[in-house]
Amino acid sequence: MGIIKDRQGFTLIELLLVIVIIAMAVAVAAPNIGSGNQTASLNAAAREIASALRFARGHALTHRKETVFLLNLEGNTYQLTDRKKVYKITKDIAVTLDAAQSQIIDKNQGGIRFFSDGSSTGGRITLELGENKRQLDVNWLTGQVEIDGW
């Protein structure tokens, strides 16, 4: 019996080395997967609120009457005047509002008013989730909405 020189397959050492490399890659990638979900959730909330603000501005322009975006910080909800539906923001997201004093109802409620010419009272809505933060700025002169922090 001779020694077989052309054996096909992998040695135990080679297989263990591949398993160690895969384990290291998973250990590095796993923490980033969770933060990606947080970022996606925060971005989605920012886009939804920005869309509602833009809708409020458009509604004020087309119907030639004031429209108010109302934000409830305690309940993490918002709604528009002339609409009964209350929209929810994920409870994990911390929301703050910096608005004109005339639009502050109490410490937990306030809003941004859009006028029939497209202008507004202006303001900033800040969304925070973990270390991630998004700011929605409403220009008082033009009523335009921008999202900062992408």
List each model region and its residues:
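N-terminal signal-anchor/signal peptide hydrophobic helix marking the start
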Residues: Q8-V20
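N-terminal helix-rich module
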Residues: G2-I4, L16, M24, V28-R54, ...
